[in-house]
Amino acid sequence: YHMIFQSKAMVYTMLAFPTISFVTYGVGYWTAPLLMRLHDVSATEVGMYIGLGSALGGLLGVTLGGVMGDKFKQRHPAGRLLVGYIAVFGTAPLVLWMVYTESLYMAFALNFVHHLFSAAWPGIPPSTAADLVLPRMRAVAGAYYILINTMLGLAMGPYMMGQLSDTFASTGMDSAESLRAAIACTLLIFIATLILLTLAWKHLPKDEASRLERARALGEDVEEVAA
């Protein structure tokens, strides 16, 4: 417990990336309903193009993100976190373009392209967590991250976008405009993401370098690990 939660780099990393998933899960959930409302198309057509674009973009994005993360790690102890910045600065403008374009097929294309960025980061938090704890603690650290990511990202992202859409609709917006505005507004959480990533970047080199010393101070037998 102390190895995980007394590491500032660990805590900031565990909070930063779920804020990205807050957006990506929410956008993934509401993209199809939004396009159906905006462009008056069938669920079959939207589902086919959105599904294929998300699957292919996600496959390429997560693979490229992992490769980039390992490359960046070789250059700087906190290098993997750069993938988080890339995800934010790639996802935000592309999602805005997707929800505000007047062309349905441009929206389909942008759905694919934004997944190259929005799906690039999932391998970064667990690999970063593994660098900050002893080998026997990696599963626990990963489990804590999955719990936080599930609660903040998977549970809250789609829900909060829907609630915000209902709030806008209650002011007189139609269902399409209210949902579009809700998606756009929730991108503001990326401000918190950037702050948390920067704090994690600041503390990660020291926390990783002091991993064995921190474990020894907590009474762990680190001789075998050090060997």
Listing of model-derived features with the role each one plays in the protein:
Residues K73-R75, A129-R138, T171:
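Paired intracellular helix-loop junctions of major facilitator superfamily
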Residues A200-A227:
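Intrinsic disorder in cytosolic terminal tails and internal cytosolic loops
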Residues I86, A92, R180-L199:
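Symmetry-related core transmembrane helices of the 12-TM Major Facilitator Superfamily/SLC fold
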Residues Q6-G65, L110, H114-P126, G153-S165:
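Extracytoplasmic gate region of multi-pass secondary transporters
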Residues D70-A87:
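Cytoplasmic membrane-interface "Motif A"-like loop-to-helix N-cap segments
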Residues S42-E45, G79-L82, Q163-I189:
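A membrane-interface helix-boundary motif in multi-pass transporters
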Residues Y85-E102:
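C-terminal ends and interior cores of transmembrane alpha-helices
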Residues A43-G47, P135-Y145:
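Loop-to-transmembrane helix entry/capping segments in MFS-fold secondary transporters
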